[in-house]
Amino acid sequence: MRKLEQFINLLSEIIECTEAESARIYSGHPSQWEINQLDGIVRPEVNELLSFALKGKVFFKYGKRQRMLESTYLITDSFSALDKTPLGRKVLDLQKLYNSL
């Protein structure tokens, strides 16, 4: 599978995980994520990357030299173990792939 296809698939999986995590929060279940993190950072960033990827392009918001995603920064800077959640693991996988593009 080409890297762009992997990128698109992973972005789609992250959107699904984000929707599932939002549903958990809205139904009253505990979550390490906060709704403002999902709605304000992760979802908009992933949707923006996906919109470019579906056109065959990789979007580097801050240039090719600065590739850390805002979602990754959120995970690594958090006091919660967001990197241990399914969504967090997928975002970190995305970061690894993004670095290789």
What are these language model-derived features?
Residues 11, 18, 39, 43-46, ...:
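Generic L/I/V-rich hydrophobic alpha-helical segments across diverse proteins
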Residues 44-61, 82-86:
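Amphipathic alpha-helical coiled-coil segments
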Residues 64-101:
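Amphipathic alpha-helical binding modules
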Residues 1-37, 98:
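Short terminal alpha-helical segments
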Residues 30-44, 62-67:
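Short, charged, amphipathic alpha-helical segments
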Residues 24, 40, 48, 60, ...:
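Intrinsically disordered, low-complexity segments enriched in glycine/proline and serine/threonine
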Residues 15, 34, 40-41, 81, ...:
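Amphipathic alpha-helical interaction segments
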